[in-house]
Each structure stands twice: as C-alpha cells, then as structure tokens.
C-alpha cells in the first residue's frame, strides 16, 4: 500500500495523462505528452555517509529539475517530442515505506504554460525561449542549495526582465511570468525542504530497509506504466546497498549472502519482491558497495547482488 503522499502524486500523473492535449503551432502538430519520471532513493542510514551519497547524485538531480522538467512538445531536428520529467525523491532508513517522499515539480503547471503559447504562430520558438529562461534562472538557485527563499517579487522581476524583449505584449508576458514563477517557487521550496530533511534525518537511522524503499518505488512505477506504458522511467539508488533490519534478521544482506552465490540470491529476491515493474527501466547504482570500514569483499558481493537483482550488465 502506498502512503497518502505517494497516492496523491500518482493520481496527479494519471490526471496529466488524461489532460495531455494535441495543439497546433507554426503549422505543425505539437503534443504535450504525459510526464516521464526520475526516481531518486537516498540512504539515510549510518552504514554509509548520506552527505556523500547525496553529493554523488546531486548534479544529476539538478539536471532533472532544470533541463528536463518542461519537456519538449515539438519535434526538433527529427527528434521526437517528449513529456516533462517528474522528479521524486525518497529514502532508505528505518521502515523506508513510511519515510517522507518529495515530488519536486508541479508538472501540471507545465501543461498550463504550454496552453498559453500553443496558439502563438511562433509556438516552438516561444517554448524554447521559455525553457532556456527557466533553466537559466532556476539552476543557480538550486546550486546554492535552496538555502534562501525565492521571493515572489524577485521571481517576477527576473522572469519579466528576461522575457520582455521576446514577448512584447504586456498581458501575455505577465501570464507567462506568473506561471513560470509558480513552477520555480514550487521547485525551490521543495528542494530546500529536501535538503533540510536530509540534514535532520541523516543520523537518525541505524537500520536500512533497502527492500522496503525499492518495493515502494516499484508500486509507483507500476501505477505510472499502467496509465502511460510509454513513459521513460529512471531509478537512481544512492545507497551502499546493505539491507539491515535487526540482528540476525533473515533479510539482512549478510544473511542472504551467506546462503549462496550473490548473483543467484539477487535473482531470487527479485522474484520474491515481485519487483517486475522495475525490469527494463533505466537503473543506476552510483553508491552500491560504498560501505564504511574495511569491508571490501563484502561490498563487492553486495554490488554483485544488486546488479543481478536488476539484471544490469557489468
């Protein structure tokens, strides 16, 4: 079962699929496609350093939040259109299924923004301008860690100044600027909340329920693919991969690996967890095996376990 935060987020994605619209600009058909999804899972337990794990993936997170979040509703140089990316952040810790989840974009606003420019005779150029402007203003704020709020007055001023030479109509520009500010404010506030949450929780978790975190992502992916089978989904696991629930627990990584070949055990656990929705999606394991202390051989076995779990090439 999902918690209510996940359920609301997934209902929103389903709604975005229903609301996807085909619109025309510059004589060509433009489609705001349903959203794609980037999932990030960060380990808060003390078997690895949460700060190091977050630093390892943060550049990729920022790229997801800025360069991919508006999508591309037009075909460009023969490349197909694609939907906006929804970035979701969850955690490994004690009872991972019940830890907080952050959805970092208000992607429904992207549809609304597209509606504002879709009837423009230069819709594709307008969308490219909005996308580049959004990226250039949002990225420095996120690189700074979302350490300070982004006041509405400053947001409106920045976007208006950047767009006034391209969108000469005052009312049109005001409507676009308002929507862009809603999106930027939402993302900066959520990102700041994410950074603060990591700082608060990183020393609070002595156990690491990796399987619980993966099962929760699997449920979310399953729901997305049900509504949009063509969705591009990416999962990044920023964890050392050690599942530790309690002393002598049968699902501890050490107990599992003691039962036989690490690769075979990974394949067996994949079937037991019914994680089939994760088969075939893009999975990255930047922190797997990064255990603290003198555990090189054990870390290597954990790395092997997870690569076989996800059927990844070496």
Which residues are covered by each model-predicted region?
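Acidic/histidine-rich, surface-exposed loop or edge segments in extracytoplasmic proteins
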Residues: 34-51, 192-201, 283-289
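VWA/integrin I-like adhesion module and closely mimicked acidic/polar interface patches used
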Residues: 242-302
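Surface-exposed cleft-lining segments at the edges of enzyme active sites
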Residues: 192-211, 251-258
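C-terminal motif of bacterial Sec signal peptides marking the signal peptidase cleavage site
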Residues: 22-25
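Von Willebrand factor
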Residues: 34-178, 234-236
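Bacterial N-terminal signal peptides that target proteins for export
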Residues: 2-13
